[in-house]
């Protein structure tokens, strides 16, 4: 099947915007140019709309198996499609954990059955994510693992992490790390700062994250592995990663939209929709994250989409689980609050959500060029509306951004040339 996207606005490598047609055929982008005509193609009229590579999110929680009340592979990937994401990477903190070839094979089969977009499954570093014994990396890679992580918890043993890094390096695979030193968590629910002091709640100090990253970058240097830091959140962590990159260590990092947009001073009362891990940090941390993204210390943006039920989030700040959803709101939030205000350019935002995560992990996605996979997102930069969780495709409604008015909403998403989501009025 052929699909012809007509008159869309494309961001060039130079950062300018120009009108182009894009022809998709047999799963790839077959032509980009002006006045393309194909008599047997399905036509999507994109006049006045932005056409980008399909967005790539390398940090999501799809909850299946074991957490289907929160999300499933089907609902999570529908949320991804609605948010413009054509590729997502699924974290392994499910029950059971994908820590064996058998479980990974089941997971990839389930993805093939019910996934709406491309899903790259992470495998666990340690059995059941308990930090006691390594999984069989070679067998997991053969079964379809994308990379290795114990996300949700940090690998506490330096010896265990070094062994994991050496095994991953042999396979030319990445170690992806949730960075927390357990002895410093202090049973905290929020950042140790303004909010925790005001409300008398135990806080998680910044050093809990940064000391773990500092340890790991030195281990990564010794092992010669690609080491990736999940959801970086503190100014000290940014400094550690910046110094490591300058030293030539193969370290990369991601940041979430919520850590770019909010700090602990923005939390209104004890609302658990503002509870995530890592927590919202201080104002200086938020500023350092923006600076780190702009100077290349931080490589790309990832949502850390983490759905929970309303009942769980209704338990209050101290008892509710950590996490918020993000797939359906990431682009409009970032476009409205950073591109429209001049902090980021449109090209920077698109790159951080497409080519940069893809290139960081040597993926073929995130490109709008002839011969690339036909993964395309169409966005109406003028469309403006308030975020309404009731309309989410995700099962999760747990967002701190409900009611925020944003511009820049995806209107069509194509994966491998197939239209997987659209607002009906965009197609003809």
Swiss-Prot record:
Pathway(s) annotated for this protein in UniProt: Pyrimidine metabolism; UMP biosynthesis via de novo pathway; (S)-dihydroorotate from bicarbonate: step 3/3
GO molecular function, one term: zinc ion binding
Record's protein name: Dihydroorotase
GO terms for biological process, alphabetical: 'de novo' UMP biosynthetic process; purine nucleobase catabolic process
Species of provenance: Halalkalibacterium halodurans (strain ATCC BAA-125 / DSM 18197 / FERM 7344 / JCM 9153 / C-125) (Bacillus halodurans)
Binding residues annotated for Zn(2+) 2, in chain numbering: 151, 178, 231
SUPFAM superfamilies documented for this protein: Composite domain of metallo-dependent hydrolases, Metallo-dependent hydrolases
Record-linked PANTHER family: ALLANTOINASE (PTHR43668:SF2)
Active site: 304
InterPro entries (UniProt xref): Amidohydro-rel, DHOase, DHOase/Allantoinase_Hydrolase, Dihydroorotase_CS, Metal-dep_hydrolase_composite, Metal_Hydrolase
Signal peptide span: none
GO cellular component: cytoplasm
Cofactor: Zn(2+)
Gene3D superfamilies on file: Metal-dependent hydrolases, Urease, subunit C, domain 1
Keywords annotated in UniProt: Hydrolase, Metal-binding, Pyrimidine biosynthesis, Zinc
Pfam families xref list: Amidohydro_1 (PF01979)
UniProt catalytic activity: (S)-dihydroorotate + H2O = N-carbamoyl-L-aspartate + H(+)
